[in-house]
Amino acid sequence: VLSSDDKCNVKAVWSKVAGHLEEYGAEALERMFCAYPQTKIYFPHFDLSHGSAQIRAHGKKVFAALHEAVNHIDDLPGALCRLSELHAHSLRVDPVNFKFLAQCVLVVVAIHHPGSLTPEVHASLDKFLCAVSSVLTSKYR
């Protein structure tokens, strides 16, 4: 459960991310594909080369969804219901992949905003990403 401090921390750091959804999203996906190559199986039709238009577009979608989640931080299930159903029923993404992506999101935020990612903010953002992952996997049950 996210505390009020966690929510404030997430909103504060995300305000710095919000202007870079495509760039950071693409970077997070590229990191995930490199660090966890098994995740590539969900994207057989993508050009997975650095900076590809498909990675940039999908990265923007991923970070736009996270942006929406931040904007609805008090109702993550409502904000992410459609995506949860899509990933569980249509795409059948293995739930562990959400944790892989969350790790890469944290790394990207740390690289671009090192001064903002204090230990407390890091913990809050990690809790938020875990909550998002939990909601996205809720339809698997």
Swiss-Prot record:
**Tissue expr:** Red blood cells.
Q: Which SUPFAM superfamilies match?
A: Globin-like
User: InterPro entries per the record?
Assistant: Globin, Globin-like_sf, Globin/Proto, Hemoglobin_a-typ, Hemoglobin_oxygen_transport, Hemoglobin_pi
User: Which superkingdom is the protein from?
Assistant: Eukaryota
Q: Does the keyword Phosphoprotein apply?
A: no
User: Quaternary state and partners of this protein?
Assistant: Heterotetramer of two alpha chains and two beta chains.
Q: Name one Pfam family in it.
A: Globin
Q: Where is the Globin domain?
A: 1-141
Task: State the function annotated in the UniProt record.
Answer: Involved in oxygen transport from the lung to the various peripheral tissues.
Protein's GO biological process: hydrogen peroxide catabolic process
By sequence similarity, the record places it as follows:
Belongs to the globin family.
Could you name the Gene Ontology cellular component terms for this entry? blood microparticle; haptoglobin-hemoglobin complex; hemoglobin complex
Residue runs in coiled coils: none
Any one GO MF term held by the record is: haptoglobin binding
**Which positions does UniProt annotate for O2 binding?**
58
Q: Which organism is it from?
A: Crocodylus niloticus (Nile crocodile)
Q: State what protein this is by name.
A: Hemoglobin subunit alpha
Q: Report the gene name.
A: HBA
* Annotated residues for binding of heme b: 87
Tell me the keywords, alphabetical order: Heme, Iron, Metal-binding, Oxygen transport, Transport
